[in-house]
């Protein structure tokens, strides 16, 4: 533990790490012209025949700081990113600080159940899964044995298919999430969650 001179902050651990992850795939029937398998992008008529692809852009680096202050108690600061941005540039995946069961920053959304997601080779993940990240302020209550309750306020992000008449507008309110989870061992749990959100859009009607 390294304490800063003249302050009440004690740094217990800090480090930088990461991993290299590479995948290879062979498409026998020209399903999708993308390194990720996105079912919505499958064309009605195949445009591509056999093709081989490799990708290492999901390699990840992270920075982590663990410490203690009288005001915040034990705290953790964590940032991580990979190279899935445009043209394989760096893309932020997590950037948050947690203390006294409060999390502030950019991390996994409160409506998703991260522990229920299966491991997949494809970076896109399982089809139909609820997976997203959001800038948020969240609180987790752990005062009851085997139970965990969480509530969060999140920055809204709406993604959808648009057209010349339909556009996604600026959102007017944050998203609100809440969840309750019961665990009876290290690998089994039941979780109930809900979300309140407003999705604002504009629609231009053409009169003939």
Regions found by a protein language model. Give the residues of each.
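Single conserved hydrophobic/aromatic residue that forms the stacking wall/gate
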Residues: 1-6, 11, 206-207
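Short glycine/serine/threonine-biased micro-segments
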Residues: 4, 16, 191
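Outer membrane beta-barrel
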Residues: 13-36, 44-158, 172-187
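Surface-exposed beta-loop-beta
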Residues: 162-205
């Amino acid at each position: 533990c390294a304490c800063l001179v003249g302050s009440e902050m004690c740094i217990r651990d800090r480090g930088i790490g990461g991993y290299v992850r590479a995948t290879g795939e062979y498409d026998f029937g020209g399903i999708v012209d993308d390194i990720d398998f996105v079912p919505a992008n499958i064309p009605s008529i195949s445009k591509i025949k056999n093709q081989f692809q490799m990708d290492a852009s999901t390699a990840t680096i992270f920075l982590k700081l663990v410490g203690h202050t009288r005001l915040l108690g034990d705290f953790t600061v964590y940032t991580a990113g990979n190279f899935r941005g445009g043209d394989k540039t760096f893309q932020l995946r997590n950037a948050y600080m947690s203390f006294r069961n409060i999390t502030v920053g950019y991390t996994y959304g409160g409506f998703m159940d991260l522990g229920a997601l299966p491991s997949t080779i494809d970076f896109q993940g399982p089809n139909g899964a609820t997976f997203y990240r959001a800038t948020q302020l969240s609180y987790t209550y752990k005062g009851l044995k085997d139970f965990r309750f969480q509530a969060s306020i999140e920055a809204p992000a709406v993604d959808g298919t648009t057209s010349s008449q339909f556009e996604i507008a600026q959102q007017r309110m944050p998203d609100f999430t809440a969840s309750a989870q019961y665990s009876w061992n290290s690998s089994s749990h039941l979780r109930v969650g809900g979300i309140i959100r407003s999705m604002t859009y504009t629609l231009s009607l053409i009169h003939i």
